[in-house]
Amino acid sequence: MSDLENFVPTANIKVIGVGGGGNNSVETMIQAGIQGVEFIVANTDIQALQRSSAPNFIHLGENKRGLGAGANPEVGKKAAEESIVEIKEKLKGADMVIITSGMGGGTGTGASPIIAKIARELGALTISIVTTPFEFEGNLRNKNAQEGIKNLRAVSDSIIIISNNKLLEQYGDAPMKDSFLFADTILKHTVKTITDIIAIPAHINLDFADVKTVMKDKGDALIGIGRASGKDRAVKAAIHAISSPIIETSIQGASHTIINITGSANLTLTEVHSAVNVIKNAVGPEMNTIFGATINESIGDEIYVSVIATGLSSSKKFNSEQEIKDEVSSMLKTMEIDLQASETKTILINDPLPKDEKMVLTSLLDRDSKILEKDDSQDDTLPFFLKRNV
């Protein structure tokens, strides 16, 4: 039986993409067939809204000429303030609102905090998932992004920040245009991890109340996704998840985690326990954990482990991939793990995330590249020199 046949809506979840980057991310999610959510796009740019497949849209601002925010966050903020009645109407009835946007431009940076504040006032669990600019995009754009994140953090229950610079470290050899699709793919996976936990029936089930416990009033959060196959696959996938290329900082010290383990019918309870135990050891003894396990026959011998960690300090410094790997290696040296193969621990200590085990982005990118054949000339998240028709 497919996930779609199994799908049972249990909470009213709305995903709203704000600005050019947010609109693009929502389009990726729609085309990927994410189930159990209502999609909304919001923009000051009417052309961007007309290109979207989302069933619901909000044209921000009283000025309906629809010319965009000109990369000015104040314009985006004012436009959202002028559209409060419509925003409230579109978000009404939601149990959870997920806001996705690119920080640094005008609409996403300025309007997202206004929308998050409204969602929270309406009683919805409010989660913001945002991207930050590449360093080469300049000081002003990066400064705007940091100010936007500060404003968004103050009005969100949880915020997950995905750094384009971090993606550049990992996938810098990819064509430049594809770098933005990597970010969209990760945003899609982040939203899907959250919504699947709530909406897809599982053998070890989680629901909206579980997600609310972990994410309400928790501030900074992160997501890690790992995969592995063969002997000790659960342990390896868990280690890969906490060493994930998209993790901005160490998972150590998080107050709460959601762990979701996906495997085929041969997934065992011992493997589930092993994966959860690895992450509990990495985070620390004070962590509160909830976990679920889902069967998906399409992934064959692989196991996927997704972890969302919340309650991280906003002052915690960002770490490079090597710094995170070094920390995981050090932790592994003293961790007691039941393993099928004696060499597994040594292999993981030497390299917690081998290149061939990194999250499967490249294969997904081929599909998403076909999905997002769009006109980027109005996308306020793209650097000027990457836009078409200029």
UniProtKB/Swiss-Prot annotation:
Encoding gene per record: ftsZ
Subcellular location field: Cytoplasm
KW Hydrolase (keyword) present: no
Binding positions (GTP): G20, G21, G22, N23, N24, G106, T107, G108, E137, R141, D184
One Pfam family from the record: Tubulin
Record's keyword terms, sorted: Cell cycle, Cell division, Cytoplasm, GTP-binding, Nucleotide-binding, Septation
Superkingdom, natural source: Bacteria
Family annotation (InterPro entries): Cell_div_FtsZ, Cell_div_FtsZ_CS, FtsZ/CetZ, FtsZ_C, Tub_FtsZ_C, Tubulin/FtsZ-like_C, Tubulin/FtsZ_2-layer-sand-dom, Tubulin/FtsZ_GTPase_sf
GO molecular function: GTP binding; GTPase activity
Protein name: Cell division protein FtsZ
Entry GO terms, CC: cell division site; cytoplasm
GO BP, one annotated term: protein polymerization
Functional description taken from the UniProt entry: Essential cell division protein that forms a contractile ring structure (Z ring) at the future cell division site. The regulation of the ring assembly controls the timing and the location of cell division. One of the functions of the FtsZ ring is to recruit other cell division proteins to the septum to produce a new cell wall between the dividing cells. Binds GTP and shows GTPase activity.
Quaternary structure note: Homodimer. Polymerizes to form a dynamic ring structure in a strictly GTP-dependent manner. Interacts directly with several other division proteins.
Alphabetized Gene3D superfamilies for the sequence: Tubulin/FtsZ, C-terminal domain, Tubulin/FtsZ, GTPase domain
Family: Belongs to the FtsZ family.
